[in-house]
């Protein structure tokens, strides 16, 4: 047992150098009583107890990283591996088998005998874009690899030079690391506000025996609950990076700051270094963390095993011509310990940027420290506040004098202690998600504690909700006797986490912990609100949200089991609230821009969610799912036609037209044109069935008729049809010298139009009737949004649209009296995945229909290009991990494919449903 009374800055304490160079075998200095003040600058009598220490742990030791695209990188026995979630049969989701990303053979042996012989991977971290992966070894060497898609070759962007392999002992080990976020607008969701509630909302879900079908708003009206959502604009925090640059920053045990920068996409990373302090024995650090600030700088907190905390302000001056310049200012050096005085070792340290409107304007960052002993863990939360000192700045600078780091600041920084919590459950790691707006602490038994750090509404007209826990969700503890994780990686949506065991990566999904017998209508509605809000957060922050949809599916199954009368109502409530939370209304205005529908990524995610929650085992999809599947196809067709027609029309002056490229582009649209023509035939088959069955046909669920009556989907269909007409016009304009390829392209397009069972002229006439009458109906109805949701969520034709539906049948009857429609009876459109037909005759739409990505002869269909896949030597098949669609992969480096301006280039990384492409060998 040793005792000492440290001075304010700990500069005169004598320590055993060996304990500081090697992983320290020291206990944290502690006090038997709580310090009397909240600021941590008081001299305290402290004790080092070597008998009660735990296993030492350094910073920057994250063995798993989950990127925004859904790819999980982890350190395995053979090197760095990657996994991702895939849907195997339409309902069950599993982790793929690991794929070796960076083998451990890339670790180069030390070049001198003074280096610790063991070198292993210890830290992985994805870049903000999710394309570059930083890999750090135990001696501080940094490797950066990049992969544009899961099928593209892996590129090494940074490999440590030979001089980095002569590290003395482990002083160059990196103990703090982060990627520098690019400067871009930050949009954050505010907590939702719910209000109201009646006696029916208190009813147990198991007691709900009868519920009328209808529009989605009936469930809210039944419970008397209302809700509002909101978003806010956030500031970019941290250094401003020039457009196209990439950067990451780290600090070593000897307090050497390292900045790796990239001068453009796919360019190698270069290193810039700055020594923060002279190498004294008590300047060796074990943990460090970075956080961006509003003045476009960074704060760096470093912790020494001697019990000292160092705080620096880091500034980066960027230059496109020269290497960036680093400047550092030491703000303070103080003692840091638990307030309780219990002997413990610091095992985790994190700085978090300030996103909340509930903190002081002087607060620059939040710091959380975890101290661990043999009995449990203590978490201390602090605020870093900057004040203008009362003394002259000359006197103040004497207290922060440093020969290596600049000390010209005129502000004094304080560490203000806020909260200390103690638990007997060991904390394995802490972290944050969604731009530091959510803090989490992961325990070794699998329990996670979350805390919201974002903006708080000032309104008192409702109860706020934001986190999963606000609706009763939590993670179930790991089974007793199972492997205890040493690191837990939380997904970007906070709906799941993964951890490593001896058997590989394991996945756990958040569960609703409210017992089935206690679940009320109000709690069910709360669940819909929270799930919709968390889904909107993933849409706004553009992160993969497969795990959120998994939670939705579980809750739908639970509600359906407890209250069969709500089997359809709860999914419809989820859909309606998800659209409301993202502020996307299906009731579009007349002047709504077409590009906002085609390119809107949030709409794509909403449609994907509707498809996923309506898909069951065997890839069978109910009508709700098929409606969104059709909408996604229309979005794909309209985007591809627009993209291609613009590429063809943008002829550079003075440059001869590239006829080969032109023909290649036009031929690539053949499958999409076929999809539009077959959808028109499918619509006519529905009209034929309605004509034969009579008015009762309109009381059932449908796909084609609701799609042409709803305003948003009708806009896409009209736009696609006009694109096809423009495509035919271009093909009729023959060049001066027509090549054989051009002739074949023209012939192919003419054949598509010729062999369709319905003439394009009739469909245009029918479509004009629908468009004009639908506008008249919608203008005279107050609740147009409810009508749109009834069409696109349920596939039901509202009462207000029945006269229009009958008018369409009358127009079709007139047409078939003068035209031979016998081919329509036997025309197979099952490949669209929208309906099933047997024996060549239309059948009523079944409740469920399997999705087919193969023809009747077993040939696979390219779900992206809409043509039959013919396997050629060297071709690679890719599969969507979400919808199981199959497509041919074409490497973007192949210049013959004109991928830079080819419409398929937009879907090189992701499927048109938003899922990730994976190699067919991984399987789904």
From Swiss-Prot:
Record protein name field: Mediator of RNA polymerase II transcription subunit 16
Location relative to the cell: Nucleus
Any one Gene Ontology cellular component term annotated for this protein: mediator complex
Family: Belongs to the Mediator complex subunit 16 family.
InterPro entries: Mediator_Med16, Mediator_Med16_C, Mediator_Med16_N
PANTHER family hit by this protein: MEDIATOR OF RNA POLYMERASE II TRANSCRIPTION SUBUNIT 16 (PTHR13224:SF6), THYROID HORMONE RECEPTOR-ASSOCIATED PROTEIN-RELATED (PTHR13224)
Chief localization: nucleus
Species this protein is from: Yarrowia lipolytica (strain CLIB 122 / E 150) (Yeast)
An example Gene Ontology biological process: positive regulation of DNA-templated transcription
Statement: the UniProt record of this protein carries the keyword Transcription: yes
Protein role: Component of the Mediator complex, a coactivator involved in the regulated transcription of nearly all RNA polymerase II-dependent genes. Mediator functions as a bridge to convey information from gene-specific regulatory proteins to the basal RNA polymerase II transcription machinery. Mediator is recruited to promoters by direct interactions with regulatory proteins and serves as a scaffold for the assembly of a functional preinitiation complex with RNA polymerase II and the general transcription factors.
Domain of life: Eukaryota
Keyword tags: Activator, Nucleus, Transcription, Transcription regulation
Subunit structure: Component of the Mediator complex.
């Amino acid at each position: 047992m040793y005792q000492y009374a440290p001075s304010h800055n700990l500069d005169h304490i004598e320590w055993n150098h060996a304990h500081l160079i090697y992983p320290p075998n020291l206990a944290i200095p502690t006090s038997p009583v709580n310090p009397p003040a909240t600021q941590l600058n008081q001299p305290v009598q402290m004790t080092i107890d070597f008998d009660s220490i735990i296993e030492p742990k350094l910073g920057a030791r994250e063995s798993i990283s989950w990127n925004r695209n859904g790819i999980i990188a982890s350190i395995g026995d053979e090197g760095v591996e990657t996994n991702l979630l895939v849907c195997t049969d339409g309902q069950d989701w599993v982790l793929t088998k690991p794929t070796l990303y960076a083998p451990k053979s890339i670790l180069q042996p030390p070049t001198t005998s003074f280096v610790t012989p063991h070198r292993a991977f210890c830290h992985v971290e994805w870049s903000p874009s999710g394309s570059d992966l930083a890999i750090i070894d135990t001696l501080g060497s940094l490797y950066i690899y990049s992969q544009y898609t899961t099928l593209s070759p892996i590129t090494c962007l940074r490999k440590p030079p030979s001089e980095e392999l002569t590290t003395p002992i482990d002083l160059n080990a990196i103990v703090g690391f982060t990627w520098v976020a690019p400067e871009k607008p930050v949009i954050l969701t505010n907590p939702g506000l719910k209000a109201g509630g009646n006696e029916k909302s208190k009813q147990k879900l198991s007691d709900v025996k009868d519920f009328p079908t209808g529009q989605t708003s009936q469930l809210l009206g039944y419970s008397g609950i209302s809700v509002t959502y909101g978003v806010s604009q956030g500031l970019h925090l941290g250094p401003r990076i020039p457009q196209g640059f990439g950067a990451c920053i780290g600090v070593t045990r000897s307090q050497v700051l390292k900045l790796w920068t990239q001068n453009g996409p796919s360019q190698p990373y270069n290193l810039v270094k700055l020594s923060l302090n002279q190498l004294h024995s008590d300047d060796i650090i074990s943990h460090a963390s970075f956080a961006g600030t509003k003045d476009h700088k960074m704060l760096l907190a470093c912790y020494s095993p001697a019990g000292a905390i160092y705080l620096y302000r880091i500034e980066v001056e960027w230059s496109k011509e020269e290497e960036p310049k680093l400047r550092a200012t030491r703000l303070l050096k103080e003692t840091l310990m638990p307030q309780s005085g219990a002997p413990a070792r610091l095992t985790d340290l994190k700085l978090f940027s300030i996103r909340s409107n509930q903190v002081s304007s002087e607060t620059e960052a939040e710091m959380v420290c975890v101290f661990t002993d043999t009995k449990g863990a203590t978490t201390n939360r602090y605020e870093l506040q900057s004040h203008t000192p009362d003394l002259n700045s000359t006197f103040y600078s004497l207290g922060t004098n440093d020969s290596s780091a600049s000390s010209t600041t005129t502000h004094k920084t304080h560490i203000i202690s806020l909260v200390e919590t103690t638990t007997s459950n060991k904390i394995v790691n802490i972290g944050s998600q969604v731009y530091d707006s959510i803090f989490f602490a992961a325990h070794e038994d699998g329990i996670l504690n979350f805390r919201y750090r974002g903006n708080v509404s000032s309104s008192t007209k409702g109860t706020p909700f934001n986190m999963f826990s606000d609706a009763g969700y939590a993670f179930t503890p790991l089974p007793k006797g199972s492997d205890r994780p040493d690191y837990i990686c939380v997904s970007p949506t906070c709906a799941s986490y993964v951890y490593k065991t001896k058997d590989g990566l394991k996945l756990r999904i958040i569960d609703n912990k409210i017992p089935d017998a206690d679940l009320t209508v109000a709690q069910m509605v709360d669940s819909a609100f929270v799930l919709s809000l968390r889904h909107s957060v993933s849409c706004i922050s553009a992160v993969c949200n497969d795990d959120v949809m998994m939670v939705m599916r579980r809750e739908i199954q639970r509600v359906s089991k407890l209250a069969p009368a709500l089997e359809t109502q709860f999914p419809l409530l989820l859909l309606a609230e998800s659209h409301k939370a993202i502020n996307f209304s299906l009731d579009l205005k007349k002047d709504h821009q077409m590009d906002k529908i085609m390119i809107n990524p949030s709409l794509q995610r909403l449609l994907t969610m509707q498809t996923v929650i309506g898909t069951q085992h065997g890839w069978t999809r109910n009508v709700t799912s098929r409606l969104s599947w059709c909408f996604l196809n229309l979005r794909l067709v309209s985007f591809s036609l627009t993209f291609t027609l613009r590429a063809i029309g943008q002829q550079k002056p003075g440059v001869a037209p590239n006829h080969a490229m032109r023909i290649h582009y036009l031929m690539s649209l053949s499958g999409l044109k076929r999809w539009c023509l077959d959808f028109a035939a499918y619509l006519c088959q529905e009209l034929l069935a309605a004509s034969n069955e009579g008015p009762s046909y309109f009381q059932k669920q449908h796909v084609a008729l609701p799609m042409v009556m709803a305003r948003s989907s009708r806009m896409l269909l009209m736009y696609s049809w006009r694109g096809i007409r423009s495509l035919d016009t271009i093909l009729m304009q023959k060049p001066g010298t027509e090549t054989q390829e051009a002739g074949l392209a023209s012939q192919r397009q003419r054949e598509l139009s010729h062999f369709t069972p319905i003439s394009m002229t009739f469909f245009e006439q029918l479509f004009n009737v629908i468009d004009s009458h639908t506008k008249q109906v919608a203008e005279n109805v107050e609740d147009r949004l409810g009508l749109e949701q009834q069409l696109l969520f349920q596939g039901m034709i509202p009462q207000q649209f029945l006269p229009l539906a009958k008018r369409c049948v009358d127009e079709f009857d007139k047409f078939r009296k003068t035209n031979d429609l016998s081919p329509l009876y036997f025309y197979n459109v099952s490949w669209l995945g929208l309906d099933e037909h047997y024996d060549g005759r239309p059948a009523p739409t079944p409740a469920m229909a399997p999705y087919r990505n193969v023809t009747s002869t077993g040939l696979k269909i390219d779900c992206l290009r809409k043509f039959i896949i013919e396997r050629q030597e060297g071709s690679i098949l890719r599969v969507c991990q979400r919808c199981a669609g199959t497509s041919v992969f074409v490497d973007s480096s192949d210049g013959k494919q004109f991928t830079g301006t080819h419409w398929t280039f937009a879907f090189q990384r992701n499927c048109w449903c938003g899922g990730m492409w994976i190699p067919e060998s991984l399987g789904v």
